[in-house]
Amino acid sequence: MYPIFLLVSSCFLFSVLAALIKFGSQFIHPIEQAFFRNLISILLLIPFVIQTKKIINKSSNIKLLVLRGIFGGITMILLFWSYSLIPLSQAMAVSFSTPLFIYLGAILFFKEKTSRLNNFIILLGFILTIIIIRPDLEIKFGVILALIAAITHAIAGLLVKKISRNESVITLMFSMVLLMTPIAGIPTMMVWSTPNIYQLYLLIIISVIATLGNFCWTKALSITKLTNLMSFDFSKLLFTTILGFIFFDEKIDLITIICGSGLILCSNIKFISVRRNEKNKTILPDN
């Protein structure tokens, strides 16, 4: 239950983050927002790093930490950029290929056992998402950015699962923003615009929400099977669709409502299944 709560919380926080980035893109380029998001996150995490004392240990895999940072940096820049170019619901819908990639990666690389229900829900969720996207529509630059980000995000997620066996969540988060700051900083120089005091407040809020969302996401992936979580990742589409409708006057058509309802049903079925399994484990006596 706790991992599911963490993942759904991260979905909500990332949806709010997407809305803030879209709003902020009117004044600050998304790449510059990505740079400040990481820079401010370093400052936010330093007290926790000091408390941890030893952030890198003998068993740390530096190469994987660097790889995770690189893929995370690419994901962030591309996602932030896509939010400014296409409707939130469409950007988030495209990113829903990420759960499918992570799901398949968990089975192939981590040999996680799955069930027919898991397979059915993840496949149905992906199909419903594709219907919402409607690929027959014009493929815009923002859609391409979101799709590439979905692939790099999945790779980053699989690396998190691999590294989390030996690393703390703080190590994973701090190493990521430490690497992502220069990655986002280089292209930021080409689009730089000095933020005023109000824009700086917005950047701080973006960074705080992104840091909280990343903590929930990283923690959730590190403490349970990936195949048990990915069906709940579709809740992001519901959150972003609602936020887009309320704040950006983005239209919600009948197809989106029907498919969105299907995604909610998928998540509820999976939730009931997890609860039932937990109760069965509790009832079974110890041998």
Give the positions of each predicted feature.
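Membrane-interface interhelical linkers
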Residues: 1-12, 42-67, 116, 165, ...
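Juxtamembrane helix-entry segments on the extracytoplasmic side of multipass membrane proteins
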Residues: 1-3, 35, 57-61, 134-155, ...
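Hydrophobic/small/kink-forming positions within alpha-helical transmembrane segments
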Residues: 11-16, 46, 69, 73-77, ...
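Transmembrane alpha-helical segments that form core, pore/gating elements
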Residues: 19-22, 30, 45, 136-195, ...
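Helix-helix packing/entry segments at the starts of transmembrane helices
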Residues: 36, 91-97, 163-178, 214-246
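Alpha-helical transmembrane segments of compact multi-pass small-molecule transporters, enriched
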Residues: 40-44, 94-108, 120-123, 179-183, ...
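Loop-to-transmembrane alpha-helix entry segments
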Residues: 95, 111-131, 140-143, 197, ...
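C-terminal-most transmembrane helix of multi-pass membrane proteins
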Residues: 234-287
